[in-house]
């Protein structure tokens, strides 16, 4: 990147990415009219992915059928847009700080959509659904923290393209055979949906720990990592004890980690080192409190569960939006400054 505040290096070890770009993206980029804004491609892809999530959630009560074949088509449209926008920007000379910010910011949301769709496709097994749907956006947020601390954007062997391909297989199986048939498959004592989500959770958790280790090795500060870590433990405990149900735990976990990720992007834009987020620590205390109530009393009233979940989701969802707007304005200012100095 040419803007100092946004300068970083990328280490992408994705297995499928080189082949995906070579055969499915690069040959088609010249067909995109030069007048189309790369940011329009980014926004369009995000909206298509959001529509896929909405359609799948609406179709969740169905055992099988056409929605489970159509949703993968929408998801692959988004995936293509997400990889074509940068190439189109470079080809047409439309690269910008705003485009880079949108790409990373919306990737945080899109990663959350993809794991939530995976959970729905597999029939939403209770505990592992929460674990996977929370730890994946957490991993994305922690990756942005590492990027802000070290200036290196690290992506693992199993990433976006691999996740979408796996989701496509799960959706196709759901469409053909239904959720009961998938749940009936066991690997040892593990139902297949539980095993898949457990593996996803462990891989993402390993990625989080590797991020923290790399930051420490490069002399970065681990203090900003503490609150997100405690919050993750709190949500896991709340889900394991039944203090929070599947939906409420996913909403709370995803909203807090999206907020964390957007904050890390903003720190990098401003050229600042990440700071601890006191609000995330407060959220962890609240969730620990709900879990503690469940363990002491034996039951959490629905009003308490959804009251706590509703407040946390609304507050951190709203704060993520505010921080996103702040970042949007900041990169627009960077683009204007770059244009003025050109």
Feature names for model-found ranges:
Residues 47-54, 109, 169-176:
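Generic alpha-helical transmembrane segments of integral inner-membrane proteins
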Residues 29-30, 85, 89, 93-106, ...:
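Juxtamembrane helix-capping/reentrant segments at transmembrane boundaries
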Residues 100-114, 159-166:
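Alpha-helical transmembrane segments that form the membrane-embedded catalytic/substrate-binding core
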Residues 34-44:
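Membrane-interface helix starts
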Residues 48, 106-107, 135-139, 162, ...:
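Transmembrane alpha-helical core residues of multi-pass small-molecule transporters
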Residues 42-98, 114-118, 126-139, 191-202:
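Membrane-embedded alpha-helical segments that form the functional core of polytopic membrane enzymes
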Residues 1-32, 140-144, 150-342:
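C-terminal membrane-associated helical module and adjoining short loops/tails
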């Amino acid at each position: 990147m040419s803007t100092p505040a946004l300068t970083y290096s990328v280490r992408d070890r994705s297995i499928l990415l080189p082949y995906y770009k070579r055969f499915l993206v690069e040959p088609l980029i010249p067909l995109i009219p030069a007048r189309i804004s790369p940011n329009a491609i980014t926004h369009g892809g995000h909206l298509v992915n959001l529509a896929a999530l909405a359609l799948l959630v609406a179709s969740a009560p169905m055992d099988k059928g056409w929605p489970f074949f159509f949703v993968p088509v929408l998801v692959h449209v988004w995936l293509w847009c997400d990889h074509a926008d940068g190439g189109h920007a470079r080809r047409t000379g439309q690269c910008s700080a705003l485009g880079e910010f949108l790409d990373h910011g919306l990737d945080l949301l899109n990663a959350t959509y993809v794991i939530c769709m995976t959970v729905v496709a597999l029939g939403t097994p209770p505990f592992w659904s929460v674990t996977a749907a929370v730890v994946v956006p957490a991993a994305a947020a922690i990756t942005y923290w590492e990027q802000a601390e070290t200036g290196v954007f690290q992506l693992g062997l199993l990433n976006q393209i691999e996740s979408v391909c796996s989701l496509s297989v799960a959706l196709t199986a759901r469409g053909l055979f239904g959720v009961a048939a998938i749940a009936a498959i066991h690997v040892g004592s593990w139902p297949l949906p539980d095993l898949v989500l457990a593996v996803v959770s462990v891989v993402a958790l390993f990625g989080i720990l590797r991020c923290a280790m790399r930051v420490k090795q490069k002399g970065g500060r681990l203090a900003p990592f503490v609150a997100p870590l405690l919050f993750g433990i709190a949500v896991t405990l709340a889900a394991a004890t039944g203090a929070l149900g599947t939906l409420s735990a996913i909403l709370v976990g995803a909203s807090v980690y999206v907020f964390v990720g957007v904050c890390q992007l903003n720190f990098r834009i401003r050229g600042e080192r990440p700071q601890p987020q006191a609000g995330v620590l407060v959220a962890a205390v609240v969730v620990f409190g709900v879990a503690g109530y469940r363990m002491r009393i034996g039951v959490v009233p629905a009003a308490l569960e959804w009251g706590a979940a509703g407040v946390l989701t609304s507050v951190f969802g709203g704060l993520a939006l505010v921080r996103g707007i702040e970042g949007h304005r900041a990169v627009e200012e960077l683009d204007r400054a770059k244009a003025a100095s050109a």
